[in-house]
Curated annotation (Swiss-Prot):
Coiled coil: none annotated. The modification Phosphothreonine is found at T6. F-type ATPases have 2 components, CF(1) - the catalytic core - and CF(0) - the membrane proton channel. CF(1) has five subunits: alpha(3), beta(3), gamma(1), delta(1), epsilon(1). CF(0) has four main subunits: a(1), b(1), b'(1) and c(9-12). InterPro entries: AAA+_ATPase, ATP-synt_VA_C, ATP_synth_F1_bsu, ATPase_a/bsu_AS, ATPase_alpha/beta_chains, ATPase_F1/V1/A1_a/bsu_N, ATPase_F1/V1/A1_a/bsu_N_sf, ATPase_F1/V1/A1_a/bsu_nucl-bd. CDD domains: ATP-synt_F1_beta_C, ATP-synt_F1_beta_N, F1-ATPase_beta_CD. This is ATP synthase subunit beta, chloroplastic. One of its GO terms (molecular function) is ATP hydrolysis activity. It catalyses: ATP + H2O + 4 H(+)(in) = ADP + phosphate + 5 H(+)(out). The gene is atpB. GO terms for cellular component: chloroplast thylakoid membrane; proton-transporting ATP synthase complex. It is a peripheral membrane protein. The modification Phosphoserine is found at S13. ATP binds at G172, G173, A174, G175, V176, G177, K178, T179. It comes from Brassica napus (Rape). Keywords: ATP synthesis, ATP-binding, CF(1), Chloroplast, Hydrogen ion transport, Ion transport, Membrane, Nucleotide-binding, Phosphoprotein, Plastid, Thylakoid, Translocase, Transport.
Length: 498
Protein backbone atom coordinates (compact mmCIF):
# COMPACT_ATOMS: atom_id res chain seq x y z
CA UNK A 1 0.00 0.00 0.00
CA UNK A 2 1.34 3.50 -0.93
CA UNK A 3 1.53 5.87 2.04
CA UNK A 4 0.25 9.39 1.45
CA UNK A 5 3.46 11.47 1.34
CA UNK A 6 1.76 14.45 3.02
CA UNK A 7 0.99 12.46 6.19
CA UNK A 8 4.00 10.14 6.24
CA UNK A 9 7.23 10.65 8.13
CA UNK A 10 9.49 13.18 6.26
CA UNK A 11 12.40 10.72 6.15
CA UNK A 12 10.13 8.14 4.48
CA UNK A 13 8.88 10.68 1.92
CA UNK A 14 12.48 11.59 1.03
CA UNK A 15 13.23 7.91 0.45
CA UNK A 16 10.08 7.61 -1.66
CA UNK A 17 10.88 10.64 -3.80
CA UNK A 18 14.60 10.06 -4.22
CA UNK A 19 16.53 7.07 -5.42
CA UNK A 20 18.58 5.49 -2.65
CA UNK A 21 21.97 3.87 -3.24
CA UNK A 22 24.80 2.51 -1.10
CA UNK A 23 28.52 3.26 -1.02
CA UNK A 24 30.42 0.37 -2.63
CA UNK A 25 33.96 1.80 -2.62
CA UNK A 26 35.82 4.89 -1.37
CA UNK A 27 39.19 5.99 -2.76
CA UNK A 28 40.08 9.40 -1.32
CA UNK A 29 37.57 11.96 -2.61
CA UNK A 30 36.09 9.47 -5.13
CA UNK A 31 33.06 7.33 -4.23
CA UNK A 32 31.59 4.39 -6.14
CA UNK A 33 27.87 4.08 -5.37
CA UNK A 34 25.60 1.12 -6.23
CA UNK A 35 21.95 1.88 -7.12
CA UNK A 36 18.99 -0.44 -7.71
CA UNK A 37 18.50 -1.48 -11.38
CA UNK A 38 16.69 1.22 -13.37
CA UNK A 39 17.30 3.88 -10.69
CA UNK A 40 20.65 5.20 -11.93
CA UNK A 41 21.27 8.95 -11.46
CA UNK A 42 22.25 11.20 -14.36
CA UNK A 43 25.75 12.60 -14.90
CA UNK A 44 26.29 15.76 -12.73
CA UNK A 45 23.44 14.84 -10.35
CA UNK A 46 24.11 15.70 -6.71
CA UNK A 47 24.34 12.78 -4.28
CA UNK A 48 24.13 13.33 -0.52
CA UNK A 49 25.58 11.00 2.14
CA UNK A 50 24.17 11.53 5.64
CA UNK A 51 24.86 9.59 8.80
CA UNK A 52 27.19 9.44 11.79
CA UNK A 53 30.82 8.41 12.05
CA UNK A 54 32.29 6.08 14.72
CA UNK A 55 32.54 9.00 17.18
CA UNK A 56 28.89 9.89 16.70
CA UNK A 57 29.70 13.08 14.75
CA UNK A 58 27.18 14.00 12.06
CA UNK A 59 28.27 13.45 8.45
CA UNK A 60 26.84 15.42 5.52
CA UNK A 61 28.84 14.97 2.32
CA UNK A 62 27.64 16.15 -1.10
CA UNK A 63 29.08 14.48 -4.21
CA UNK A 64 28.67 14.96 -7.95
CA UNK A 65 28.19 12.05 -10.38
CA UNK A 66 31.02 11.96 -12.94
CA UNK A 67 30.84 8.50 -14.54
CA UNK A 68 28.33 5.68 -15.05
CA UNK A 69 30.43 2.52 -14.63
CA UNK A 70 27.92 -0.19 -15.54
CA UNK A 71 26.66 -2.96 -13.20
CA UNK A 72 24.38 -0.31 -11.65
CA UNK A 73 27.32 1.65 -10.25
CA UNK A 74 28.24 5.31 -10.57
CA UNK A 75 31.48 7.11 -9.72
CA UNK A 76 31.13 10.44 -7.92
CA UNK A 77 33.53 13.11 -6.67
CA UNK A 78 33.05 14.52 -3.15
CA UNK A 79 32.77 18.29 -2.61
CA UNK A 80 34.05 18.02 0.98
CA UNK A 81 36.27 15.70 3.05
CA UNK A 82 35.28 12.01 3.02
CA UNK A 83 36.59 11.15 6.52
CA UNK A 84 34.08 9.03 8.44
CA UNK A 85 32.38 7.55 5.37
CA UNK A 86 32.26 3.77 5.08
CA UNK A 87 30.96 1.12 2.71
CA UNK A 88 27.27 0.37 2.91
CA UNK A 89 26.20 3.89 3.94
CA UNK A 90 23.00 5.21 2.34
CA UNK A 91 23.40 7.71 -0.52
CA UNK A 92 20.45 9.85 -1.70
CA UNK A 93 20.24 10.91 -5.37
CA UNK A 94 18.86 14.46 -5.26
CA UNK A 95 17.67 14.14 -8.87
CA UNK A 96 19.26 17.45 -9.95
CA UNK A 97 22.71 19.04 -10.28
CA UNK A 98 24.12 21.10 -7.40
CA UNK A 99 22.02 24.25 -6.93
CA UNK A 100 23.18 27.43 -5.21
CA UNK A 101 21.37 30.56 -3.90
CA UNK A 102 21.23 33.50 -6.32
CA UNK A 103 20.00 37.09 -6.30
CA UNK A 104 20.53 40.23 -4.22
CA UNK A 105 20.62 38.28 -0.94
CA UNK A 106 24.03 36.85 -1.93
CA UNK A 107 25.71 40.30 -1.82
CA UNK A 108 28.10 40.88 1.08
CA UNK A 109 28.27 37.15 1.87
CA UNK A 110 30.96 34.46 1.52
CA UNK A 111 29.86 31.10 0.11
CA UNK A 112 31.46 27.71 -0.38
CA UNK A 113 31.08 25.58 -3.51
CA UNK A 114 27.66 24.28 -2.34
CA UNK A 115 26.32 27.82 -1.89
CA UNK A 116 26.38 27.56 1.91
CA UNK A 117 27.21 30.87 3.67
CA UNK A 118 30.40 30.67 5.73
CA UNK A 119 30.77 34.15 7.26
CA UNK A 120 28.58 33.66 10.36
CA UNK A 121 25.85 36.12 9.36
CA UNK A 122 23.04 33.57 9.47
CA UNK A 123 21.20 31.85 6.61
CA UNK A 124 20.82 33.52 3.21
CA UNK A 125 17.49 35.28 2.86
CA UNK A 126 16.48 33.80 -0.49
CA UNK A 127 14.45 30.88 -1.79
CA UNK A 128 15.76 31.32 -5.34
CA UNK A 129 18.38 28.77 -6.35
CA UNK A 130 19.96 27.87 -9.67
CA UNK A 131 21.83 24.76 -10.91
CA UNK A 132 25.58 25.27 -11.50
CA UNK A 133 25.56 23.32 -14.78
CA UNK A 134 23.95 25.20 -17.66
CA UNK A 135 24.35 25.66 -21.39
CA UNK A 136 25.99 28.80 -22.75
CA UNK A 137 23.48 31.42 -24.02
CA UNK A 138 22.02 30.65 -27.46
CA UNK A 139 23.47 32.51 -30.47
CA UNK A 140 20.21 34.40 -30.97
CA UNK A 141 20.44 35.84 -27.41
CA UNK A 142 24.02 37.09 -27.73
CA UNK A 143 24.85 40.76 -28.05
CA UNK A 144 27.62 40.93 -30.66
CA UNK A 145 28.10 44.70 -30.45
CA UNK A 146 31.74 45.54 -29.81
CA UNK A 147 31.58 48.12 -27.05
CA UNK A 148 34.13 49.42 -24.56
CA UNK A 149 33.55 48.73 -20.89
CA UNK A 150 34.57 52.00 -19.24
CA UNK A 151 36.30 51.42 -15.89
CA UNK A 152 37.16 55.03 -14.98
CA UNK A 153 40.82 53.96 -14.64
CA UNK A 154 42.89 56.02 -17.10
CA UNK A 155 45.64 53.52 -17.94
CA UNK A 156 43.14 50.71 -18.59
CA UNK A 157 40.62 52.74 -20.61
CA UNK A 158 43.26 54.39 -22.80
CA UNK A 159 45.85 51.66 -23.50
CA UNK A 160 44.19 48.28 -22.91
CA UNK A 161 40.41 48.87 -22.90
CA UNK A 162 38.11 46.13 -21.65
CA UNK A 163 35.35 44.76 -23.81
CA UNK A 164 31.82 44.73 -22.41
CA UNK A 165 31.16 41.03 -21.87
CA UNK A 166 34.81 40.21 -22.54
CA UNK A 167 37.47 38.27 -20.69
CA UNK A 168 40.59 39.91 -19.31
CA UNK A 169 43.72 38.19 -18.02
CA UNK A 170 45.31 39.86 -14.97
CA UNK A 171 48.99 39.09 -14.60
CA UNK A 172 50.72 40.22 -11.42
CA UNK A 173 52.93 38.94 -8.64
CA UNK A 174 52.56 39.50 -4.91
CA UNK A 175 52.45 43.05 -3.59
CA UNK A 176 51.99 44.98 -6.85
CA UNK A 177 48.41 46.10 -6.18
CA UNK A 178 46.29 43.34 -7.72
CA UNK A 179 43.80 43.27 -4.83
CA UNK A 180 43.41 47.06 -4.76
CA UNK A 181 42.85 47.13 -8.55
CA UNK A 182 40.21 44.39 -8.21
CA UNK A 183 38.44 46.31 -5.42
CA UNK A 184 38.51 49.58 -7.40
CA UNK A 185 36.95 47.84 -10.41
CA UNK A 186 34.24 46.40 -8.13
CA UNK A 187 33.58 49.89 -6.71
CA UNK A 188 33.54 51.66 -10.10
CA UNK A 189 31.22 49.19 -11.83
CA UNK A 190 28.74 49.63 -8.96
CA UNK A 191 28.83 53.44 -9.20
CA UNK A 192 29.10 54.01 -12.95
CA UNK A 193 27.18 51.04 -14.34
CA UNK A 194 24.83 50.19 -11.46
CA UNK A 195 26.35 46.75 -11.64
CA UNK A 196 27.47 44.17 -9.12
CA UNK A 197 30.45 41.87 -8.83
CA UNK A 198 31.06 38.24 -7.97
CA UNK A 199 34.49 37.10 -6.78
CA UNK A 200 35.39 33.42 -7.28
CA UNK A 201 38.43 32.35 -5.25
CA UNK A 202 39.47 29.14 -7.01
CA UNK A 203 42.20 27.36 -5.05
CA UNK A 204 42.75 30.56 -3.04
CA UNK A 205 45.04 30.67 -0.02
CA UNK A 206 42.71 30.99 2.98
CA UNK A 207 44.78 33.93 4.27
CA UNK A 208 44.46 35.80 0.93
CA UNK A 209 40.71 35.23 0.88
CA UNK A 210 40.39 36.50 4.44
CA UNK A 211 42.57 39.55 3.70
CA UNK A 212 40.41 40.40 0.67
CA UNK A 213 37.23 40.14 2.76
CA UNK A 214 38.66 42.35 5.54
CA UNK A 215 39.91 44.96 3.04
CA UNK A 216 36.52 45.00 1.29
CA UNK A 217 34.80 45.65 4.62
CA UNK A 218 37.28 48.43 5.45
CA UNK A 219 36.86 50.14 2.07
CA UNK A 220 33.04 49.92 2.07
CA UNK A 221 32.70 47.44 -0.82
CA UNK A 222 31.05 45.13 1.74
CA UNK A 223 28.69 46.74 4.28
CA UNK A 224 27.94 44.24 7.07
CA UNK A 225 25.50 46.60 8.81
CA UNK A 226 23.37 46.81 5.66
CA UNK A 227 24.21 43.89 3.36
CA UNK A 228 21.93 45.25 0.60
CA UNK A 229 24.44 48.12 0.15
CA UNK A 230 27.27 45.66 -0.55
CA UNK A 231 28.58 45.48 -4.10
CA UNK A 232 30.04 41.97 -4.22
CA UNK A 233 29.34 38.31 -3.48
CA UNK A 234 32.33 36.11 -2.60
CA UNK A 235 32.64 32.40 -3.40
CA UNK A 236 35.68 30.56 -2.04
CA UNK A 237 37.08 27.11 -2.71
CA UNK A 238 40.33 27.16 -0.77
CA UNK A 239 43.59 25.31 -1.40
CA UNK A 240 42.84 22.79 1.37
CA UNK A 241 39.50 21.78 -0.18
CA UNK A 242 39.16 18.50 -2.12
CA UNK A 243 39.75 18.81 -5.89
CA UNK A 244 36.01 18.42 -6.59
CA UNK A 245 35.24 21.63 -4.69
CA UNK A 246 38.06 23.57 -6.38
CA UNK A 247 36.93 22.35 -9.80
CA UNK A 248 33.31 23.46 -9.28
CA UNK A 249 33.68 26.69 -7.26
CA UNK A 250 34.23 28.69 -10.48
CA UNK A 251 30.87 27.43 -11.77
CA UNK A 252 29.16 28.40 -8.48
CA UNK A 253 30.46 31.98 -8.82
CA UNK A 254 29.50 32.07 -12.52
CA UNK A 255 25.95 30.85 -11.74
CA UNK A 256 25.47 33.72 -9.27
CA UNK A 257 26.79 36.18 -11.88
CA UNK A 258 24.47 34.76 -14.58
CA UNK A 259 21.40 35.46 -12.41
CA UNK A 260 22.37 39.14 -12.05
CA UNK A 261 22.81 39.31 -15.85
CA UNK A 262 19.76 37.36 -17.01
CA UNK A 263 17.11 38.11 -14.36
CA UNK A 264 18.19 41.47 -12.87
CA UNK A 265 19.51 42.60 -16.30
CA UNK A 266 22.65 44.14 -14.80
CA UNK A 267 26.24 44.48 -15.93
CA UNK A 268 28.27 42.06 -13.82
CA UNK A 269 31.98 41.86 -13.11
CA UNK A 270 33.19 38.30 -12.44
CA UNK A 271 36.63 37.78 -10.90
CA UNK A 272 38.29 34.38 -11.01
CA UNK A 273 41.47 33.97 -8.99
CA UNK A 274 43.13 31.81 -10.17
CA UNK A 275 42.00 30.29 -13.47
CA UNK A 276 45.09 28.05 -13.51
CA UNK A 277 43.92 26.39 -10.29
CA UNK A 278 40.60 25.56 -11.96
CA UNK A 279 42.58 23.61 -14.59
CA UNK A 280 44.80 22.06 -11.90
CA UNK A 281 41.77 20.80 -9.93
CA UNK A 282 40.31 19.35 -13.14
CA UNK A 283 43.60 17.54 -13.73
CA UNK A 284 43.47 16.00 -10.22
CA UNK A 285 39.87 14.84 -10.69
CA UNK A 286 40.69 13.42 -14.12
CA UNK A 287 43.51 11.32 -12.65
CA UNK A 288 41.28 10.14 -9.77
CA UNK A 289 38.65 9.02 -12.30
CA UNK A 290 41.29 6.97 -14.11
CA UNK A 291 41.41 8.92 -17.37
CA UNK A 292 44.52 8.71 -19.52
CA UNK A 293 46.51 11.94 -19.07
CA UNK A 294 47.22 14.22 -22.03
CA UNK A 295 50.20 16.57 -22.70
CA UNK A 296 52.28 17.49 -19.60
CA UNK A 297 49.98 15.33 -17.46
CA UNK A 298 46.89 17.49 -17.96
CA UNK A 299 43.40 16.07 -18.38
CA UNK A 300 42.41 15.02 -21.95
CA UNK A 301 39.25 17.15 -21.54
CA UNK A 302 41.18 20.40 -20.79
CA UNK A 303 39.84 22.43 -23.75
CA UNK A 304 36.26 21.22 -23.22
CA UNK A 305 36.31 22.07 -19.49
CA UNK A 306 37.77 25.52 -20.12
CA UNK A 307 35.30 26.15 -22.96
CA UNK A 308 32.27 25.12 -20.88
CA UNK A 309 33.23 27.76 -18.26
CA UNK A 310 34.39 30.54 -20.61
CA UNK A 311 31.53 30.32 -23.13
CA UNK A 312 28.99 31.12 -20.39
CA UNK A 313 30.86 34.39 -19.72
CA UNK A 314 29.39 36.67 -22.39
CA UNK A 315 27.08 39.59 -23.23
CA UNK A 316 23.43 38.94 -23.95
CA UNK A 317 20.68 41.35 -24.95
CA UNK A 318 19.74 41.59 -21.24
CA UNK A 319 23.12 42.34 -19.65
CA UNK A 320 26.77 41.39 -19.63
CA UNK A 321 29.32 39.43 -17.62
CA UNK A 322 32.78 40.91 -17.94
CA UNK A 323 35.35 38.57 -16.46
CA UNK A 324 38.75 39.40 -15.01
CA UNK A 325 40.84 36.30 -14.47
CA UNK A 326 44.15 36.10 -12.64
CA UNK A 327 46.44 33.84 -14.66
CA UNK A 328 49.34 31.97 -13.08
CA UNK A 329 51.92 30.88 -15.63
CA UNK A 330 53.76 27.77 -14.37
CA UNK A 331 57.55 28.19 -14.58
CA UNK A 332 56.91 31.30 -16.76
CA UNK A 333 56.22 28.93 -19.67
CA UNK A 334 53.52 30.51 -21.84
CA UNK A 335 53.37 27.37 -24.00
CA UNK A 336 52.20 25.25 -21.03
CA UNK A 337 48.77 23.78 -21.96
CA UNK A 338 46.95 25.51 -19.05
CA UNK A 339 47.84 29.17 -19.84
CA UNK A 340 47.90 28.46 -23.60
CA UNK A 341 44.29 27.24 -23.43
CA UNK A 342 43.32 30.28 -21.33
CA UNK A 343 44.92 32.79 -23.75
CA UNK A 344 42.67 31.55 -26.56
CA UNK A 345 39.66 32.98 -24.66
CA UNK A 346 41.08 36.37 -23.55
CA UNK A 347 40.16 39.72 -25.15
CA UNK A 348 42.67 41.80 -23.16
CA UNK A 349 45.62 41.41 -20.80
CA UNK A 350 46.42 43.73 -17.88
CA UNK A 351 50.02 43.26 -16.74
CA UNK A 352 51.08 44.71 -13.37
CA UNK A 353 54.70 45.82 -13.14
CA UNK A 354 56.86 45.56 -10.03
CA UNK A 355 59.08 48.34 -11.40
CA UNK A 356 56.18 50.81 -11.53
CA UNK A 357 54.99 49.76 -8.06
CA UNK A 358 58.51 50.40 -6.74
CA UNK A 359 58.34 53.94 -8.22
CA UNK A 360 55.06 54.49 -6.35
CA UNK A 361 53.00 54.68 -9.54
CA UNK A 362 49.63 53.10 -8.79
CA UNK A 363 47.81 51.41 -10.43
CA UNK A 364 51.07 49.71 -11.46
CA UNK A 365 49.69 48.64 -14.87
CA UNK A 366 52.48 48.23 -17.43
CA UNK A 367 51.43 50.47 -20.35
CA UNK A 368 53.65 48.66 -22.89
CA UNK A 369 53.00 45.03 -21.89
CA UNK A 370 49.21 45.31 -21.46
CA UNK A 371 47.23 44.55 -24.64
CA UNK A 372 43.66 44.58 -25.90
CA UNK A 373 41.90 43.36 -29.05
CA UNK A 374 39.58 46.38 -28.65
CA UNK A 375 42.30 48.93 -29.43
CA UNK A 376 41.37 49.30 -33.11
CA UNK A 377 40.30 52.53 -34.87
CA UNK A 378 36.98 51.03 -36.06
CA UNK A 379 36.02 50.14 -32.45
CA UNK A 380 37.44 52.93 -30.27
CA UNK A 381 37.60 55.66 -32.93
CA UNK A 382 40.55 57.38 -34.61
CA UNK A 383 41.26 59.91 -31.84
CA UNK A 384 41.45 57.29 -29.06
CA UNK A 385 43.57 54.96 -31.21
CA UNK A 386 46.03 57.68 -32.30
CA UNK A 387 46.39 59.02 -28.74
CA UNK A 388 47.07 55.52 -27.37
CA UNK A 389 49.67 54.82 -30.09
CA UNK A 390 51.47 58.12 -29.47
CA UNK A 391 51.52 57.49 -25.71
CA UNK A 392 53.00 54.03 -26.29
CA UNK A 393 55.59 55.37 -28.77
CA UNK A 394 56.67 58.09 -26.32
CA UNK A 395 56.99 55.60 -23.45
CA UNK A 396 58.82 53.10 -25.68
CA UNK A 397 61.34 55.77 -26.75
CA UNK A 398 61.86 56.72 -23.08
CA UNK A 399 62.49 53.05 -22.26
CA UNK A 400 65.11 52.82 -25.06
CA UNK A 401 66.86 55.99 -23.80
CA UNK A 402 67.04 54.88 -20.16
CA UNK A 403 70.38 53.07 -20.57
CA UNK A 404 71.96 56.16 -22.17
CA UNK A 405 70.54 58.38 -19.41
CA UNK A 406 71.89 56.01 -16.72
CA UNK A 407 75.43 56.06 -18.18
CA UNK A 408 75.81 59.56 -19.67
CA UNK A 409 73.01 61.60 -18.12
CA UNK A 410 70.21 63.67 -19.63
CA UNK A 411 72.58 66.39 -20.89
CA UNK A 412 74.02 64.08 -23.57
CA UNK A 413 70.63 63.63 -25.26
CA UNK A 414 69.49 65.67 -28.26
CA UNK A 415 66.94 68.45 -27.70
CA UNK A 416 64.20 66.29 -29.26
CA UNK A 417 65.01 63.30 -27.03
CA UNK A 418 65.10 65.50 -23.92
CA UNK A 419 61.60 66.73 -24.78
CA UNK A 420 60.42 63.12 -25.34
CA UNK A 421 61.82 62.08 -21.94
CA UNK A 422 60.14 65.04 -20.18
CA UNK A 423 56.77 64.23 -21.77
CA UNK A 424 57.16 60.49 -21.11
CA UNK A 425 57.81 61.16 -17.41
CA UNK A 426 54.68 63.35 -17.27
CA UNK A 427 52.66 60.65 -19.07
CA UNK A 428 53.99 57.97 -16.70
CA UNK A 429 52.87 60.02 -13.70
CA UNK A 430 49.55 60.98 -15.30
CA UNK A 431 48.81 57.26 -15.74
CA UNK A 432 48.70 57.04 -11.92
CA UNK A 433 45.40 57.77 -10.21
CA UNK A 434 43.98 57.99 -6.66
CA UNK A 435 41.55 55.13 -5.94
CA UNK A 436 38.27 55.32 -4.02
CA UNK A 437 39.02 52.10 -2.14
CA UNK A 438 42.45 53.42 -1.09
CA UNK A 439 41.03 56.64 0.43
CA UNK A 440 41.06 55.12 3.92
CA UNK A 441 44.80 54.41 3.59
CA UNK A 442 46.05 57.43 1.60
CA UNK A 443 43.72 60.19 2.77
CA UNK A 444 43.34 61.52 -0.81
CA UNK A 445 39.88 61.24 -2.42
CA UNK A 446 39.43 58.73 -5.25
CA UNK A 447 38.84 59.84 -8.84
CA UNK A 448 36.74 58.34 -11.64
CA UNK A 449 37.96 59.68 -15.00
CA UNK A 450 35.71 59.32 -18.04
CA UNK A 451 37.21 58.12 -21.32
CA UNK A 452 36.74 61.47 -23.13
CA UNK A 453 38.53 63.30 -20.28
CA UNK A 454 41.36 60.73 -20.36
CA UNK A 455 41.92 61.17 -24.11
CA UNK A 456 41.79 64.98 -23.81
CA UNK A 457 44.38 64.96 -21.02
CA UNK A 458 46.92 62.80 -22.85
CA UNK A 459 46.43 64.75 -26.09
CA UNK A 460 47.29 67.99 -24.28
CA UNK A 461 50.47 66.46 -22.79
CA UNK A 462 51.54 65.05 -26.18
CA UNK A 463 50.89 68.37 -27.94
CA UNK A 464 53.35 70.14 -25.62
CA UNK A 465 50.68 72.29 -24.00
CA UNK A 466 52.04 71.48 -20.53
CA UNK A 467 55.78 71.26 -21.22
CA UNK A 468 56.36 74.08 -18.73
CA UNK A 469 54.56 72.36 -15.82
CA UNK A 470 56.52 70.29 -13.26
CA UNK A 471 56.09 66.49 -13.54
CA UNK A 472 55.00 66.25 -9.85
CA UNK A 473 51.78 68.05 -10.86
CA UNK A 474 50.69 64.99 -12.89
CA UNK A 475 51.23 62.46 -10.09
CA UNK A 476 48.12 60.90 -8.50
CA UNK A 477 45.52 63.23 -10.00
CA UNK A 478 42.25 62.59 -11.83
CA UNK A 479 41.74 64.60 -15.02
CA UNK A 480 44.14 67.12 -16.62
CA UNK A 481 42.42 70.14 -15.00
CA UNK A 482 43.41 68.78 -11.58
CA UNK A 483 47.01 68.54 -12.80
CA UNK A 484 47.06 72.23 -13.81
CA UNK A 485 45.46 73.21 -10.48
CA UNK A 486 48.08 71.13 -8.64
CA UNK A 487 50.85 72.86 -10.65
CA UNK A 488 49.51 76.27 -9.58
CA UNK A 489 49.44 75.13 -5.93
CA UNK A 490 53.01 73.80 -6.17
CA UNK A 491 54.16 77.12 -7.63
CA UNK A 492 52.48 79.09 -4.84
CA UNK A 493 53.99 76.80 -2.19
CA UNK A 494 57.49 77.23 -3.62
CA UNK A 495 57.05 81.05 -3.65
CA UNK A 496 55.90 81.02 -0.02
CA UNK A 497 58.95 78.97 0.99
CA UNK A 498 61.23 81.56 -0.63
Amino acid sequence: MRINPTTSDPAVSIREKNNLGRIAQIIGPVLDVAFPPGKMPNIYNALVVKGRDTLGQEINVTCEVQQLLGNNRVRAVAMSATEGLKRGMDVVDMGNPLSVPVGGATLGRIFNVLGEPVNNLGPVDTLTTSPIHKSAPAFIDLDTTLSIFETGIKVVDLLAPYRRGGKIGLFGGAGVGKTVLIMELINNIAKAHGGVSVFGGVGERTREGNDLYMEMKESGVINELNLADSKVALVYGQMNEPPGARMRVGLTALTMAEYFRDVNEQDVLLFIDNIFRFVQAGSEVSALLGRMPSAVGYQPTLSAEMGSLQERITSTKKGSITSIQAVYVPADDLTDPAPATTFAHLDATTVLSRGLAAKGIYPAVDPLDSTSTMLQPRIVGEEHYETAQQVKQTLQRYKELQDIIAILGLDELSEEDRLTVARARKIERFLSQPFFVAEVFTGSPGKYVGLAETIRGFNLILSGEFDSLPEQAFYLVGNIDEATAKATNLEMESKLKK
